[in-house]
C-alpha cells in the first residue's frame, strides 16, 4: 500500500517519507478500512515534530480518516464490508495511522459515515467533531442554556457552536480575528466578541442577559481561565480541550469555590466507546439534515503530506486540512 511515515522526529520536509509497504489484515474484532482521506490535526503535527516520544521505530501519522470497509476480522458483522465509515484514534498509542491506503482498527473506532458527507468531511470528524460534541454534551443536555465558545473560528470551536445551537443552546463566541466574525455568526453564534476587549466580562454579560453563561468551552483554557471564572455563572461549567499557550495557569480556587464552578478537561482519545458512538450518531444526524458545516480549508494528495503539515502548523485557516488517498 502507499503510505507516509517517519522514523525520526523533525521538520515535515525532513522526516516524512512517501512510499510502499504491506498492509495488515484485520485481527479478531478489527476492521480493515480502505482509506480515501486522512485528516491532519494539530496533535499529529506536534507528535511528528517531537512533542512526545515516538514510541515506535516507524510511525504512519494521523488519527482521523474516512473510507470503505474492505474486510473484517472474526467477531465483526460481515455486513459492514462495503460500508462508508470514518475512523478515529488511528495513531493513538499505535504505530499505524491513517496516512496510508489502509488501516486496521478495533471495530469500536469505526463509525458510519452518511452518504451526505464526502470522505474529506469524514476525515475531519474524528478529533474535531467528537471533541466538539463531548465539550458541549458531556454533562447532559444544554437546551435553554447560554454557552460561551472561546476562539469561535477554530475548527473544533466552530463545530461546537453548531452542535450547541442544534441542541437548543444560545451561543456566544469570542475571536481575535475580525475577518472570521461573519463566518462564526454563520455557525449560529448570536454574538461574536473580541476576546482582547478589556471589558470582555461586561460584554459577555450584556450578550448573555439575566440567565448568564452556564457553560464555557475553550481550546486555550489556561490563557482565558481567569476571565472565564469571572464570566461563568454560579454552578456553571468550564470545559477545556486544550491549553498550549498557558499549560500551567494559576487557579483562583476560592473565586471558583464561592460560585461552585466546575472546571473539567476532556481528551477525545479517551472517550468511552458508548460516548463516542452517541456523539458519532449526533454528528451523522446533523450531516444528514444538512445542519452541520464541516469546513475543509485545504485538500492535498497523500504525496504532499509535508505541505499539509506546514499548513496546519501555520494555523490561520478556516477548517481542516485533508489528504486525499486515491
Outline where the language-model segments fall.
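Short glycine-centered segments of the SAM/dcSAM-binding site in methyltransferase folds
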Residues: 84, 146, 170, 236-237, ...
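C-terminal hydrophobic helical "lid"/dimerization subdomain
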Residues: 1, 274-326
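Short, glycine/polar-rich helix-capping loops at beta-to-alpha or helix-loop-helix junctions
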Residues: 98-99, 175-183, 248-253
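Mid-domain Rossmann-like dinucleotide-binding core that forms the NAD(H)/NADP(H) cofactor-binding site
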Residues: 123-197
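Glycine-rich beta-strand-centered segment in the early N-terminal region that forms part
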Residues: 22-40, 49-91
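Glycine-rich phosphate-binding loop and adjacent beta-alpha segment
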Residues: 223-292, 325-326
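NAD(P)H dinucleotide-binding glycine-rich loop of Rossmann-like/cofactor-binding domains
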Residues: 78, 88-151
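Short amphipathic alpha-helix with an adjacent loop that forms part of the alpha/beta core around
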Residues: 199-210
Amino acid at each position: 500500500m502507499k503510505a507516509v511515515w517517519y522514523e525520526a522526529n523533525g521538520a515535515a520536509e525532513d522526516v516524512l517519507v512517501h512510499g510502499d509497504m504491506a498492509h495488515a489484515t484485520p485481527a479478531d474484532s478489527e476492521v480493515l478500512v480502505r482509506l480515501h482521506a486522512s485528516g491532519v490535526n494539530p496533535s499529529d503535527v506536534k507528535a511528528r515534530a517531537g512533542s512526545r516520544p515516538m514510541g515506535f521505530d516507524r510511525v504512519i501519522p494521523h488519527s482521523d480518516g474516512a473510507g470503505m470497509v474492505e474486510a473484517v476480522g472474526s467477531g465483526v458483522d460481515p455486513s459492514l464490508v462495503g460500508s462508508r465509515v470514518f475512523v478515529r484514534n488511528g495513531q493513538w498509542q499505535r504505530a499505524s495511522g491513517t496516512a496510508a491506503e489502509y488501516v486496521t482498527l478495533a471495530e469500536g473506532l469505526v463509525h458510519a459515515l452518511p452518504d451526505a458527507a464526502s470522505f474529506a468531511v469524514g476525515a475531519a470528524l474524528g478529533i474535531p467533531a467528537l471533541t466538539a460534541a463531548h465539550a458541549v454534551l458531556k454533562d447532559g443536555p444544554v437546551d435553554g442554556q447560554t454557552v460561551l465558545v472561546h476562539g469561535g473560528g477554530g475548527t473544533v470551536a466552530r463545530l461546537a457552536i453548531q452542535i450547541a445551537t442544534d441542541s437548543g443552546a444560545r451561543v456566544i463566541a469570542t475571536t481575535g480575528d475580525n475577518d472570521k466574525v461573519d463566518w462564526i455568526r454563520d455557525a449560529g453564534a448570536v454574538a461574536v466578541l473580541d476576546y482582547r476587549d478589556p471589558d470582555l466580562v461586561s460584554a459577555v454579560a450584556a450578550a448573555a442577559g439575566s440567565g448568564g453563561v452556564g457553560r464555557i468551552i475553550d481550546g486555550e483554557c489556561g490563557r482565558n481561565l481567569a476571565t472565564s471564572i469571572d464570566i461563568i455563572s454560579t454552578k456553571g461549567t468550564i470545559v477545556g480541550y486544550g491549553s498550549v499557550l498557558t499549560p500551567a495557569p494559576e487557579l483562583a480556587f476560592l473565586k471558583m469555590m464561592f460560585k461552585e464552578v466546575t472546571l473539567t478537561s476532556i481528551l477525545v482519545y479517551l472517550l468511552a466507546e458508548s460516548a463516542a458512538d452517541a456523539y458519532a450518531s449526533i454528528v451523522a444526524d446533523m450531516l444528514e439534515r444538512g445542519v452541520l458545516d464541516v469546513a475543509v480549508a485545504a485538500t492535498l494528495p497523500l504525496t504532499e503530506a509535508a505541505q499539509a503539515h506546514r499548513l496546519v502548523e501555520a494555523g490561520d485557516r478556516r477548517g481542516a486540512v485533508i489528504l486525499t488517498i486515491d
